[in-house]
Amino acid sequence: MSSVLQLLLEGECLETHQMAEILGMDETEVESELARLRDEKVLLGWRPVFNPAEVEDDLVRAVIEVKISPEREGGFDRLALRISRFDEVESSYLMSGGYDLLVIVAGKNLRSVATFVSERLATIDGVLSTSTHFLLRAYKEQRHLLVEEAAASDKPAVSP
């Protein structure tokens, strides 16, 4: 793995001259490596990690288990890509187990997510079934704990 990529994955927001200093590289080498990582679609971008409860007032997120029928040519890929192109879809993954795709969606409210699932996702040819799970609370996001340690350990003592 590229040392520049490893430094990015550690989560610090650094300028190229800071990265060069940490890695013992020339700044132009770091810039060149970042350009290569972008060109090769290894580095797709980066975004700040935030606490959804503090930023997204009414945003509703859901995890959807989707069973799909693989196609003779291309298996799951064509249908998975079609589903992934919807604006509501934040992430999608091919899974092993009881369902084929794990789709994470976001909407402005519960109704918009429900409408997306019932009218747009479930009606696609090849989608056999969906199971939607609404996210109620986030405890960890992108390796960052979102809940204060004191609150997490405030549980009643268990008496024998």
Label each region the model flagged.
Residues 1-160:
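A compositional/biophysical signature of low hydrophobicity enriched in polar/charged and small residues
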